[in-house]
Amino acid sequence: MVNYKDLGLVNTKEMFAKAIKGGYAIPAFNFNNMEQMQAIIKAAVETKSPVILQVSKGARQYANATLLRYMAQGAVEYAKELGCPNPQIVLHLDHGDTFETCKSCIDSGFSSVMIDGSHLPYEENIALTKKVVEYAHQFDVTVEGELGVLAGVEDEVSSDHHTYTNPEEVIDFATRTGCDSLAISIGTSHGAYKFTPEQCTIDPVTGKMVPPPLAFDVLDAVMEKLPGFPIVLHGSSSVPQEEVETINKFGGALKAAIGIPEAVSYTHLTLPTTSRV
């Protein structure tokens, strides 16, 4: 058993509490190799931002659990080397689909895990999420649950349709599972290729394809039901800036999960950006 605190990592509890108070979101980047991790940490230090390093089950299998653990520890030391004396870095399992996967990550030094039971019937999702929470909280590891299904493909996670989160279920789900944050579905999409042409409309002025609009009414209703509770939006890497501003008006998303396509280089990752979730 390796405790994440021995690696210099933190969980999301204090990080999210500060974000709620400060009115900002925490970026969560999926990474698959050393170059991506270097770029993420460099950008986080330069912008003085806490950051969540996300790893899918497939990426963990590819990297090797032991090597990945030391990469995360190395990320903390790299941030210090770059001038950040107290790095706020989370190592998070993205879309864990079984209790066994989540337990394995917790036992090997992850500070946060996601259990995605959104494909299950509601009561089964609650039971699975609660089981993970009960184990994780013994070691002060935070847990993200999910209600609703995102379309798109990301590693083993795939769906050809959206199922928006039902706002009437969020209080019951959060209360009964004890999860620390909740991923919801409002129309964002997994993967590098977000929408098919059939899902888009054509802008009559520019002639460009426009993706389907996000369901801000769902976000608004969820925020009303769970004020001050950490809310997560997955598939956020291609949300336009004007949509980000609208999300912020509704109270923002406390965690924005951002995937990095394999073709994106270190140079591109470290270019200046004006986008802020």
Residue ranges and their predicted role:
Residues 2-25:
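N-terminal amphipathic alpha-helix/helix-capping segment at the start of soluble metabolic enzymes
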Residues 115-122, 254-261, 265:
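Glycine-rich phosphate-binding active-site loops on the catalytic face of alpha/beta enzymes
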Residues 50-99:
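Active-site cofactor/substrate anionic-group-binding motifs, chiefly glycine-
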Residues 100-104, 240-247, 265:
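Catalytic cores of alpha/beta
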